[in-house]
Amino acid sequence: MRQSQLFTKTFKQAPKDEVAKNAELLIRAGFVHKEMAGVYTFLPLGLRVLNKIIGIIREEMNAVGGQEVLLSALQEKSLWEKTDRWDDTKVDIWFKTMLKNGTELGLGSTHEEPMTRLLSQHINSYRDLPVLAYQFQMKFRNETRAKSGIMRVREFIMKDLYSCARSEEEHARFYAGLRAAYIRIFERVGLGEVRSYRLRHL
């Protein structure tokens, strides 16, 4: 699509209530639209960038043996009660809702519990291992303060990966492969020689 055909516009100024520089620049350039604090809509240019980044990550995850899934954003109360992470006094970022029959649900802020249950139902023997399962999924977090632009929001896409191995040694090989994959991702998206403290010291 030609830039002249875009319905979106650029702006000289960002919304007055936007205090984060990252979001201010993206709004002014016509990449995202601010719906409310911590909630942004990706416009055609922003979505194009997002999809390219996801594509690069997907290629690298598949290259190390990852299998992509897509778990439900709606999660059962009973599942999270088993790990004592449903109570708001323990985890205070839930967006909770209820079905018409009274069943309580939450919009997933993470997917450890659902993924653990899923894998436990499909892995019956060491012969089923190893497994690397990953997803790109919308997450929801009821943040008290959402003033960091697109860096800390209430609704966002997260790529998460879960591994099951036959031994600590196999798991260590997974980790080394994934570490190398992320370094390649950083380089491919233009971040260059990114080395966080965690990457340098693990």
Residue ranges and their predicted role:
Residues 1-202:
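TRNA-recognition modules of translation machinery and tRNA-sensing kinases, especially anticodon-binding
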